[in-house]
């Protein structure tokens, strides 16, 4: 039986897969440039990065299933960055405060025979209006580090979420339903 390689350094994606009894045999993060192309919209951006990550890792593991994903947080057409510092985290929170935004998840699976499956999942999230004190406290928490859009819904930021429409696991980092459908469709048996 072919092994499943998770092309991600995200511990959240690994935890999500384990939640549905999928245990990757190997974790091999892809290192690709995640900078949006000029004029690139959120959905094509998430798709492109998921596929680029899968292709980058598949070459190192012939005969394996390779699963990659990318998560993008967007306000309108604007792609928010992964927060790398408190200032960026705060800027993201200011944009998200009191607004609805989208979390777009791109998923790509490459089968041992070279077939490629792709899915894109969009979840709508609405934040309550945040006070300056709430933004400062969240920024000081450090929980935003490396997170798309500068927040982690599975942590402290959950208290700011007024409404979710769509896949919760997509917001965390990997839509489990679509991932399971891809794996099942390609004959992967956990």
Swiss-Prot record:
The residues the entry assigns to the signal sequence are none
Q: What is its EC number?
A: 3.6.1.9
Per the record, where is site Important for substrate specificity?
A: 12, 71, 154
- Write down the chemical reaction(s) this protein catalyses: dTTP + H2O = dTMP + diphosphate + H(+); UTP + H2O = UMP + diphosphate + H(+)
Q: GO CC annotations?
A: cytoplasm
Record has Lipid metabolism as a keyword: no
**Which cofactor names does the annotation list?**
a divalent metal cation
Its keywords, alphabetically, are: Cytoplasm, Hydrolase, Nucleotide metabolism
CDD domains associated with the record: Maf
Q: One short Pfam family name for this protein?
A: Maf
TM segment ranges: none
Q: Where is the active site?
A: 70
Query: Some GO term, biological process aspect, for this entry: which one?
Result: nucleotide metabolic process
Q: Name one GO molecular function term.
A: UTP diphosphatase activity
Which domain of life does the UniProt lineage start with?
Bacteria
Note the InterPro entries from the entry.
ITPase-like_fam (IPR029001), Maf-like (IPR003697)
Localization per Swiss-Prot or TrEMBL: Cytoplasm
The free-text function statement in the UniProt record for this protein reads: Nucleoside triphosphate pyrophosphatase that hydrolyzes dTTP and UTP. May have a dual role in cell division arrest and in preventing the incorporation of modified nucleotides into cellular nucleic acids.
Q: Which PANTHER family match?
A: BIFUNCTIONAL DTTP/UTP PYROPHOSPHATASE/METHYLTRANSFERASE PROTEIN-RELATED, BIFUNCTIONAL DTTP_UTP PYROPHOSPHATASE_METHYLTRANSFERASE PROTEIN-RELATED
Task: Please report which protein family the annotation says this sequence is part of.
Answer: Belongs to the Maf family. YhdE subfamily.
What is the name of this protein? dTTP/UTP pyrophosphatase
Taxonomic path: Bacteria, Pseudomonadati, Pseudomonadota, Alphaproteobacteria, Rhodospirillales
């Amino acid at each position: 039986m072919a092994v499943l390689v998770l092309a991600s350094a995200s511990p959240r994606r690994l935890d999500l897969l384990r939640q549905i009894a999928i245990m990757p045999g190997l974790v091999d993060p892809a290192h690709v440039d995640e900078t949006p192309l000029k004029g690139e919209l959120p959905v094509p951006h998430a798709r492109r990065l998921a596929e680029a990550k899968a292709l980058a890792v598949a070459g190192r593991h012939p005969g394996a299933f390779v699963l990659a994903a990318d998560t993008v947080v967007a306000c309108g057409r604007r792609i928010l960055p992964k927060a790398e510092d408190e200032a960026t985290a705060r800027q993201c929170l200011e944009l998200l405060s009191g607004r609805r935004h989208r979390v777009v998840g791109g998923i790509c699976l490459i089968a041992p025979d070279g077939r490629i499956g792709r899915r894109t999942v969009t979840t709508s999230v609405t934040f309550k209006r945040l006070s300056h004190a709430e933004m400062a406290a969240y920024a000081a928490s450090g929980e935003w580090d490396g997170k798309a859009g500068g927040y982690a819904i599975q942590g402290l930021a959950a208290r700011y979420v007024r409404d979710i429409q769509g896949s919760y696991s997509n917001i965390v980092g990997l839509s489990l339903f679509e991932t399971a459908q891809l794996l099942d469709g390609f004959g992967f048996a956990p």
